[in-house]
Amino acid sequence: MELAPAIPGTDRFDRTDREVTQAHPGVTAFVGRAARSREEREAGLDAALAPGATRPVGAGHRSRPEAPDPYRLCFERDLDRVKHSRPWRRLAGKCQVFIAPEDDHLRTRLTHAVEVAQVATGIARAVDLCLPLTEAIALAHDCGHGPAGHASEEAFSPYLPTTGYDHAVYGADVTLAPLNLCHETLDGVRNHSWRRPPPATPEGEVVAWADRIAYVCHDFQDAVRAGILTPDDLPDDVRTAVGARSSDQIGSFVLAVLAAIDQTGHVGMTEPAASALRTFRDFNFERIYLRPAARRQAERVIRLLRGLVDCFADAPRRLPEPDAADVEPGSTAATALAVRYVSGMTDRYALGLGVELLGWRPDDLPRGV
């Protein structure tokens, strides 16, 4: 194949430079421009973003000041750090709803985060919000979750009497703290739950809606696959308003968010989709999350995780922390370290330690049903 014809204004490039290694000999694909600096990209974005969108400037606002990257926007650095972090990778081993499922196609916290990012960036792209900030918040929003589902919050809360354990707050303030993310990213993580104060950015508000849209739709889909529900169980009001298929439902909810932004300039959702989302979520709580079998498993999760926290708090030398050996057993500091360690565990690891350290019989371990 011959080289692509010359592109006007690109004659300064030497496409035969012998000091450059290429993956494919004889490659003809041509970029035709040099990399733009971060400052140039920031200037271009300033004109392209919506008036209320969050502008990436310099290194961003961080707890520990950093020099800016020559090419990457500050929120792109956050996004890269999240993707390369251990807490985010461990989400692959944490359940979304069903603990230790035998079906490999049921969602994990990681696949949920990816789906939230897809929904959120789709909305953000349509209204010219800051995409890397939106995606960083979406991918990181559940990094504070403990093993074995939402029951971990109930398990850990007594050990943190001042604040309790809220996965959103703990994720932003403890789990993700070593990454030194921008304040805007951490704010979106901290406040993505609807019971929290509103996020400070429209990107964070978009993620809050995307999270609810994603989990309401895909948790029902997973419950059908697990045999807990059938497609016919879907409430009629939901079916009428947004359809029966998950793809139709997500599409309808996203269009309703965009319609609300068109009408008001603020992130929200128009009717009848908003009522359908509430009905759908209430149905999921009744028939999936709070059904008797799920509550029985949650009680096992709570006993298991509290047993592990007590075990490590009473023997902090077991903890893989550099300063754990100097901590007084049973102290507040030891308990805080134990909660941080146990909350980061995957389901498989926590269940394994239940057998190894606590003497649980495998048949007594929590299992998703």
Where are these regions (language model features)?
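Aromatic/His-enriched, Gly/Pro-containing loop or helix-boundary segments
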Residues: T162
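Conserved N-terminal alpha-helix of the aminotransferase class I/II PLP-enzyme fold
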Residues: E115
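Active-site-proximal cofactor/substrate-binding loop regions of enzyme domains
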Residues: H112, T134-G144
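Catalytic glutamate of the conserved HExxH
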Residues: D142, G146, A155, R212
